[in-house]
Amino acid sequence: MKRQLILEDGTVLIGTGFGGEIEKSGEVVFTTGMTGYQETLSDPSYCGQIVTFTYPLIGNYGINRDDFESIHPSVNGLIVNEICDHPSNFRNEISLNDYLKERKIPGLAGIDTRKLTRKIRQYGTLRGRLCNMDADVEYIVSQLKATVFTDHVKRVSTKDPYPSPGRGHRVVLVDFGMKHGILRELNKRDCDVIVVPYNTTAEEILRLSPDGIMLSNGPGDPKDVPEAIEMLKDIIGKVPLFGICLGHQLFALASGANTSKLKFGHRGLNHPVKNIATGKVAITSQNHGYAVEEESVENTELEITHVALNDGTVEGLRHKKFPAFTVQYHPEASAGPEDANDLFEDFLTMIENFKKEGEELCQNA
């Protein structure tokens, strides 16, 4: 079955269709991960995107029940050079092709993914549509140019609060499109977690008496989530806070800094990040299309703690006065290296120190 990818600039790439027999549009991006395709397609941060894999063979270990980062996949399509039809792994339960058919997600194989990746790197991310061969190219191009992809966080965030009980510190996890890996890391440390929707107010969060607040990853432009920015303005300084990815960007906006869209984003499992204070470099998992503008941090109460070695963009922030820090990358990995996993320990240490300071103030009052 032939299928084509039509880009907003009129480029047409023809290959072999697999997965769902459905047409879908989305922002065409690329990821450099050699493995972790199951985590990628189930990562809510990819909501509404058509993901191109630069690694030439995808699907060789199939799909299993353990590696999902969300219950429902949020990607709008997959593009690969070659898909493996006969996966081999002791955990395999279903092939990638069959899984995409079940979930009605279209795929395209047999195209030059290196050519497509170079195009995205040169011109930036492009809107595109995976469609059948009888599609009207001119009409689709006109539709793509007029399309604006918004409200992704609203689509992937939980609709209702729910608990993930533990005996340790109570952490309110604000879900902007949370990967399950973040929740797993908190559960490992016996945190008493309450997951809340993206539009939960500061008053509602504080009513839960949290020891700490965690801001999850999520898709899209952080400026599309004004409710969260307003919530954070009222939260910062009252409770220890740790943010990841979109949570990092929202924290920056709430603190007076600015964000902007990257040309082609950071998506992959091998991005080097430097800790400015120690000089140490961690290899990190990343997935974001926006970043905090370095110059916008200068007139705020924030300091830059980490930078990307590939392009110098901001990868970490810390508040100068209050117990709050954030990172642009994914310390929980899932998939990817676990070089930065100790940030969860830093968060819990910050909570304990904040509690001790509060107890000392009460004793001295």
From Swiss-Prot:
Q: Which GO terms describe its molecular function?
A: ATP binding; carbamoyl-phosphate synthase (glutamine-hydrolyzing) activity; glutaminase activity
EC main group: ligase
- Enumerate the catalysed reactions: hydrogencarbonate + L-glutamine + 2 ATP + H2O = carbamoyl phosphate + L-glutamate + 2 ADP + phosphate + 2 H(+)
Which one GO biological process term can you cite for this protein?
glutamine metabolic process
Name its pathway: Amino-acid biosynthesis; L-arginine biosynthesis; carbamoyl phosphate from bicarbonate: step 1/1; Pyrimidine metabolism; UMP biosynthesis via de novo pathway; (S)-dihydroorotate from bicarbonate: step 1/3
Question: Annotated region CPSase: where?
Answer: 1-166, 1-169
Could you list this entry's UniProt keywords, alphabetically sorted: Amino-acid biosynthesis, Arginine biosynthesis, ATP-binding, Glutamine amidotransferase, Ligase, Nucleotide-binding, Pyrimidine biosynthesis
Q: What is its EC number?
A: 6.3.5.5
Q: Which domain of life is it from?
A: Bacteria
- Return the similarity comment: Belongs to the CarA family.
Do you know which PANTHER family this protein is assigned to? CARBAMOYL-PHOSPHATE SYNTHASE SMALL CHAIN, MULTIFUNCTIONAL TRYPTOPHAN BIOSYNTHESIS PROTEIN-RELATED
What is this protein's function per UniProt? Small subunit of the glutamine-dependent carbamoyl phosphate synthetase (CPSase). CPSase catalyzes the formation of carbamoyl phosphate from the ammonia moiety of glutamine, carbonate, and phosphate donated by ATP, constituting the first step of 2 biosynthetic pathways, one leading to arginine and/or urea and the other to pyrimidine nucleotides. The small subunit (glutamine amidotransferase) binds and cleaves glutamine to supply the large subunit with the substrate ammonia.
What is the protein name given in its UniProt record?
A: Carbamoyl phosphate synthase small chain
Q: Which organism is it from?
A: Bacillus cereus (strain ZK / E33L)
Gene name, per UniProt, is carA
